[in-house]
Amino acid sequence: MVEFKIILSDTRTGHSYKMDVSGGAAGALIGKRVGTEIDAAPLGLNGYKILITGASDRNGTPSRRDLPGSGRRGLLLAGGVGFNPKEDGQRARKSIRGNEITADFVQINAKVATYGEKSLDELLAAPAAAAE
């Protein structure tokens, strides 16, 4: 069974929320690409649309929006996602994943693109408060 940790950022308030998703809701994310806007109703966020901004696999390898496919590749990078050069002109070969979400991913980063009627605090904080 596929499980994802979704880090959802609310750009209005500056807060981020962690969601653990499995089963059918996680299956709805497979095949989507980094940079696409999806409906968040399968995640329990009715009326919301989220934009997938990034992801990382079980080894911590980040995905790049500009790399098609789902596999891991060794790229010679001069900056951007996956490498932060310390000097001008510095390059390094780094492992990077493609932009397609697969079952190998563990964490998916997203931000709210369209807001629903209820606030994220109401939708996401209520189950955690009831469990305590």
From Swiss-Prot:
The keyword Ribosomal protein applies. Disulfide bonds: none annotated. Signal peptide: none annotated. This is Small ribosomal subunit protein eS6. InterPro entries: Ribosomal_eS6, Ribosomal_eS6_arc. Pfam families: Ribosomal_S6e. GO terms for biological process: translation. Belongs to the eukaryotic ribosomal protein eS6 family. GO terms for cellular component: ribonucleoprotein complex; ribosome. The keyword Heme does not apply. Keywords: Ribonucleoprotein, Ribosomal protein. It comes from the Archaea. One of its GO terms (molecular function) is structural constituent of ribosome.
